[in-house]
Amino acid sequence: MISFNVPPTVGKEMTYIEEAIRSHKICGDGEFTQKCSKWIEENTGTAKALLTTSCTHATELAAILANIRPGDEVIMPSYTFVSTADAFVLRGAKVIFVDIRPDTMNIDENLIEDAVTHKTRAIVPVHYAGVACEMDKICDIAREYNLMVIEDAAQAMMATYKGQALGTFGDYGCYSFHETKNYSMGEGGALLIKDSGNIMKAEIIREKGTNRSQFFRGEIDKYTWVEAGSSYLPSELNAAYLWAQLDKADEIYNDRMESWNLYYSLLAELSEKGIIGLPVIPDGCAHNAHMFYIKVKDLNERSELIHFLKGKNIKSVFHYIPLHSSPAGKRLGKFHGTDKYTTVESERLLRLPMYYGLGEDKIIYITEMIKEFFTRIRGY
């Protein structure tokens, strides 16, 4: 069976993990955590990057820093992972879902302003598949209405919009290093902070509400509890694993881009005939090959194709069930306007195997089986 995902390994993971163990410091904020944070800062230009135990926790930390409170409203797409909404619902906010663009599956920037009310506190753009939302328009709206922008860039590290790293446009940006992401630490994430004036508070909340980070830098002679916080530090073992990935980030990026481009070229004929849809990369957007998906006619055709590919030992999967259709989404959120594309397009989308080291032979086989399905089984 060709797996849908294989967590990336580059060969130095065990070396660095053993190094962390020998250092006798395997809790958070050790040498490998600092290396990873510095790498993110240098490669994105953000003022500060704090490693976290997940992208979910990075988003929760951003919601706390943004002072999201009960009764506030936060605008986001419904086509996203539950964590995007959870972080704000936990603060008592109501999520306001806005329809997506059918080309990128990102929030439709032209529908955001109409969803703004006196209760709105933040916009949360989600860069689906590492393809940027229209950040110029979104940031303009945020400035006009004095709103925070918190980027869900879980899938978007090493992707850019007009040359600028995703995750660095908003007040805060959130990365994921889950095992399904391009760069992994098993479970983990990072919070990117744009304004250096917010760094100290973020460090305090991340460190159980203490000023422990200042203590370790020698800025104070002891640390104490200074405000409410939580524990969002990953262990050094996780950070050591991630450092192996970041040290080979360009190699991973280039390998995935080769796979993405090969998929696209081999499936272009089906797209040109109108049989399937392929990903759209708007001008000014440079993606990171996080995902390769196709779009088929409808839900039934997708189910048939998944079953067919499984019979050919290929694992393919659909993606999000729109949040507004879920039990929690109906209670805790509201869809603003018309669901013209969110549900329909989500039912068409099928993700194909994509991981570091996938290789040309597997991609050729996968695309041949897709062509066989549409020519022999579906009769196109």
What are these regions (language model features)?
Residues Y175-S176, G189-D195, W243:
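Short beta-strand-to-turn element immediately C-terminal to the catalytic PLP-Schiff-base lysine
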Residues M1-I26, T224-V226, P353:
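N-terminal "arm"/small-domain region of PLP-dependent enzymes with the aminotransferase-like
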Residues I26-E73, A87-R91, F97-D99, Q164:
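Phosphate-binding glycine-rich loop
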Residues E151-M185, Q214-F215, D221-V226:
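Conserved active-site segment immediately N-terminal to the catalytic lysine
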Residues L50, I75, I96, V149-I150, ...:
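Structural detector of well-ordered beta-strand residues that form the stable sheet scaffold
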Residues A58, T80, P353:
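Conserved SAM-binding loop
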Residues I64-A153, T160:
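PLP-dependent aminotransferase-like
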Residues Q34-K38, N43-A47, N110, A122-V126, ...:
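PLP-dependent aminotransferase class I/II
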